[in-house]
């Protein structure tokens, strides 16, 4: 007997902004979404700040968005959790940080601090780095090296020079620390097994290979002169004495796991085979749990479990569910949606479609959306699933390139695919919900006319197809309770989100 599916389509990076010359969403030709808005109940949801467990005014992101959607509650995020620990002093008592620094004192080895040098708040914040430098100074460490990964996606594409200059000033002010390498996140924070990129980052940090420039600020300036912005800056070695070596300690101060896993595994996992490298022991601290299977690491801030999220709860009821996305967002519909745990629940199937191997997604704004759509439609029509969770990555990943024309094409691609998925769900007598995890593509241009590559704090859409009803405004945490509501199921007590349906 075929199941009646409830399908949730997450249009990653599709926000609701003011129409205008820099809004790829309003510029795009979207006949499907236009029709769905006109014919179905719809509302908007908050996807940023306090409503998703972030500091007030902080833009949302994919990790946070999917965690809140899957959790059915506001999930307090790592950024404010760690920042509050700095304010309370708990940060400086952290056992993992202390172990890393004490090992340096005992062995006479170096401490390496690396991560995204940015205040974007998505993967990291510089305030946490400053606190680590202060802690190292207070403990009497002298050999402290910073490997600075430039952002250019969650902040302005040319803000890196100022962050590097600020870092140099902070090191002088605190009295410890020196930038050893500087490079774009494109190399150090890959998440799609593009080993040739990651090896360039590794070789710079471990072997001191790459462009040499003792002045990190000048190195960034020269990159700009060559037309290369922060994200794509090739690794530069600023201090040949600051390479990572045997028995050194490393603290990776990024708190978001997905782009921290590959470079971490290259350092700590003796079984890593992405590229040739020497394995040696280190005291390695992951700021949060990047991967439960990661060997030879300490975790500074273990994840707080999200009990009875949507996936776990559906499984406990004996229901079936499908998670489907392409590589760039696969972790989001699985790991993050399940509250940051690797568990694949009984009855939960997963489909991974490979993202295209292109340098940047403006070169192929369609990404793998059509293949994701094909596979999703096939699974929906199979009648095998009670719930389907689907992510289209285009609006976010292409939005991050800052190329408006490509972002318009990305929106149009998603529009066509959404129509096919919704049709399949309704043909099966099911329900379809369309939403987003945060904004991005609706604001592609800065007020000064330069490209905008970061997320936004704009609200996101929520459309309910196949159930004539009235909806209220809400937040991402309200989606799971709404799914359960249309399925005629009670919410578990751990969910504090509320159904969006007005009774």
Predicted segments with their positions:
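Feature captures the catalytic ectodomains and active-site-proximal regions of enzymes
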Residues: 1-503
């Amino acid at each position: 007997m075929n199941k009646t599916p409830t399908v949730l389509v997450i249009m990653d990076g599709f926000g609701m902004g003011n129409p205008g010359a820099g809004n790829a969403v309003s510029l795009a030709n979207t006949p499907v979404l236009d029709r769905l808005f006109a014919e179905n109940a719809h509302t908007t949801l908050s996807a940023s700040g306090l409503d998703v467990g972030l500091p007030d005014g902080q833009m949302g992101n994919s990790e946070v968005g999917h965690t809140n959607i899957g959790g059915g509650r506001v999930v307090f995020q790592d950024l404010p959790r760690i920042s509050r620990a700095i304010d309370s002093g708990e940060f400086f008592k952290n056992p993992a940080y202390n172990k890393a620094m004490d090992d340096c004192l005992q062995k006479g080895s170096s401490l390496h601090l690396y991560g995204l040098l940015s205040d974007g708040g998505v993967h990291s914040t510089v305030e946490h780095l400053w606190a680590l430098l202060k802690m190292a100074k207070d403990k009497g460490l002298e050999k402290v090296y910073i490997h600075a990964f430039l952002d250019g996606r969650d902040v302005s594409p040319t803000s890196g020079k100022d962050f590097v200059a600020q870092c140099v000033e902070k090191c002088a002010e605190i009295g410890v620390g020196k930038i050893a390498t500087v490079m774009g996140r494109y190399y150090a924070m890959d998440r799609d097994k593009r080993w040739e990129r990651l090896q360039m980052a590794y070789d710079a940090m471990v072997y001191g290979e790459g462009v040499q420039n003792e002045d990190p600020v000048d190195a960034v300036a020269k990159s700009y002169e060559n037309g290369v912005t922060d994200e794509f800056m090739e690794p530069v070695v600023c201090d040949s004495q600051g390479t990572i070596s045997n028995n050194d300690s490393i603290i990776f101060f990024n708190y978001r796991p997905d782009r921290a896993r590959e470079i971490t595994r290259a350092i700590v996992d003796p079984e890593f085979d992405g590229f040739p490298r020497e394995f040696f022991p280190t005291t390695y601290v992951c700021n949060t749990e990047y991967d439960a299977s990661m060997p030879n690491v300490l975790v500074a801030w273990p994840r707080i479990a999200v009990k009875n999220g949507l996936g776990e709860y559906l499984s406990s009821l004996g229901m079936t569910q499908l998670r489907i996305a392409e590589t760039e967002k696969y972790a989001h519909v699985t790991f993050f949606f399940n509250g940051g745990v690797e568990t694949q629940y009984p009855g939960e199937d997963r489909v991974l479609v490979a993202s295209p191997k292109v340098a940047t997604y403006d070169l192929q704004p369609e990404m793998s959306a059509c293949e994701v759509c094909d596979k999703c439609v096939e699974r929906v029509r199979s009648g095998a699933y009670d719930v389907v969770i689907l992510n289209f990555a285009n609006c976010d990943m292409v939005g991050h390139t800052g190329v408006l024309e490509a972002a318009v094409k990305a929106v149009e691609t998603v529009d066509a695919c959404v129509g096919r998925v919704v049709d399949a769900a309704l043909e099966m007598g099911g329900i379809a919900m369309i939403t987003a995890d945060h904004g991005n593509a609706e604001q592609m241009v800065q007020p000064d006319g330069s490209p905008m590559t970061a997320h936004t704090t704009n609200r996101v859409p929520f459309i309910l197809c196949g159930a004539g009803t009235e909806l209220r405004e809400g937040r991402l945490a309200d989606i799971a309770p709404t799914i359960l509501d249309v399925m005629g199921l009670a919410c578990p007590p751990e969910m504090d989100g509320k159904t969006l349906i007005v009774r």
